[in-house]
Amino acid sequence: MSADGIKLLRTPGFDKSKWMQLPRDVVIGHNALDQFPAVCQDLKIGRSVMLFAGKSTMQVAGNRIEELLAPSFDISTFLARELTPESMKEGEEAACGVDLIIGVGGGRVIDTAKIVSFNLDLPFISVPTAASHDGIASGRASLQTSEGSASLTAHPPLGVVADTGIIAAAPHRLLAAGCADIISNYTAILDWELSNRLRGEPISEYAITLSRMTAEILMKNAPMIRPHQEESAWMVVKALVSSGVAMAIAGSSRPASGGEHKFSHALERLAPGKALHGEACGIGTIIMMYLHGGDWRGIRTALQQIGAPTTPAELGIPDEVAVAALMMAKTIRPERFSILDSGLTEESATALIRLLYGE
């Protein structure tokens, strides 16, 4: 069929363009690690591979990956101990000259692999051993600095291989935190839409729709999330990957990060080591949903069904620290508008924390 005569529709003054980077191969399920050689073959990478792992995650999954890839690849290992600028430099020096980086572990290890691969312009494959947050498939990474956690731009993984047997065997607290991180998409979207209306910030309807749908599906299935069940791990990992894709479409973490994430980062600074990222986001989501006039009780019920904390006391955090975190939250990433920027007094913040304990 000839293309002669076909007229291209060109809108006067239209100059938009969009570059999206998405994971290419995603394998989720029972014994997914066994498909690793096929994934590497499909991605057509070189022969030199470096595994980034922790001591425990090397035993959980890293050794098995080495065994599977050894016949066809030259494999080396870097133990990622801390998520700091110093460890990033060590990782970059170790990985210089390899063809592929594989991050095997939780958020710390995967973020290390993600940042190093981005800085060296190398592809990387994400192999989560727990489903505690949506960074397993996103193009964002967190780095610990002297001033707290900093959010960095990186590339999303070229592939994701998530073995539900391994993830289901991890402590349920990690899975529940991952669920809470997904549920927080609800208020992240509301903040983004509010910023669009009040500040004219551009939004992506596609990213918003995908992010909201992901949270809705998990909320609907909250009663089915059970400890150490592969079906539960399957459901949560799919949601985490979907959330990461929404961020890739948006070109930022906006579809999954709003005032509730600001609260989480503030709480991390004021009470370090007390709460997992997703746990704090879940509590923040209850508060932000109340401020938005939404179904905050429904959010709280879903978190309780999953087994995620809904009050600071459950995390061993004094209420006054949570109040201080709420007051500090708007100073975190001040360029990112959220409902917290509408004006929150300390008296109101105290009442919001008390609200968490109510009927």
Swiss-Prot record:
It is found in: Cytoplasm. Substrate binds at residues 134, 181, 265. Coiled coil: none annotated. It comes from the Archaea. Its EC number is 1.1.1.261. The keyword Nuclease does not apply. This is Glycerol-1-phosphate dehydrogenase [NAD(P)+]. The gene is egsA.
